[in-house]
Regions:
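Surface-exposed, polar/charged faces of alpha-helical domains
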Residues: 118, 122-125
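Cell-wall glycan-active module
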Residues: 1-65, 159-175
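Short, well-structured alpha-helical segments
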Residues: 43, 47, 57-61, 103, ...
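Substrate-binding/active-site groove segments that recognize
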Residues: 73-97, 105-117, 129, 135-136, ...
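Second-shell loop/turn segments in exported
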Residues: 29-37, 46-51, 72-77, 92-102, ...
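Catalytic and substrate-binding regions of cell-wall glycan-acting enzymes that process beta-1,4-linked
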Residues: 127-175
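Solvent-exposed coil/turn segments that connect beta secondary-structure elements
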Residues: 66-69, 89-91, 162
Length: 175
């Protein structure tokens, strides 16, 4: 896992926080049952947004997996929408007029994630905490907030990234 985090943070080793398990807090819009749920159908959008904003696509995919399980129509009980579960104010600020549109949502979410990575000097754990709990909470606690949900969220993303790196290594070895 450390190698994966090092790759995502420009070579710096980030120590993972002590965390509890994450909770999943989203509802699936009824229309989602008709939707194709193959995550690879979003690869081109993710790759394009990742390249544009300089964010590792593995990190973006892990965030999407944790946030919505690649359901572009996911809506949380608090109003977060789409693949990257953007809150209405963030969606508006980052140009996602329709946060349930996969492309608008991913581009806005990746830009927001890029801004958080810049704010925290490439520290992926702090950027993820900011994405989950908001930058105000990260500033107030001078680090990852002691919220169970946020600590679980950061750990979940780190585990998804590490799992993706392991799966890629296995696939490469099989080729």
């Amino acid at each position: 896992m450390m190698a994966a985090l090092s790759l995502l943070s420009g070579g710096r080793i980030l120590m993972p926080p002590t965390v509890d398990t994450a909770t999943e807090d989203f509802r699936i819009a009824p229309e989602a049952a008709k939707d194709d749920t193959d995550p690879s159908r979003f690869d081109s959008i993710i790759e394009e947004a990742s390249a544009l904003y300089g964010v590792n696509s593995a990190l973006v995919k892990a965030v999407i997996q944790a946030e919505s399980r690649f359901n572009p129509l996911a809506v949380s009980p608090v109003g977060a929408k789409g693949l990257m579960q953007l809150m209405p104010m963030i969606a508006k600020e980052y140009g996602a007029g329709d946060p349930l549109d996969a492309k608008q949502n991913v581009f806005a979410g990746v830009k927001y994630l890029s801004d958080l990575l810049d704010r925290y000097n490439g520290n992926v754990s702090l950027a993820l905490a900011g994405y989950n709990a908001g930058p105000t909470a990260v500033r107030r606690f001078r680090g990852i907030p002691p919220y169970r949900e946020t600590r679980g969220y950061v750990r979940k993303i780190q585990n998804l990234i590490a799992e993706g790196v392991r799966n890629a290594a296995v696939a490469t070895a099989d080729d």
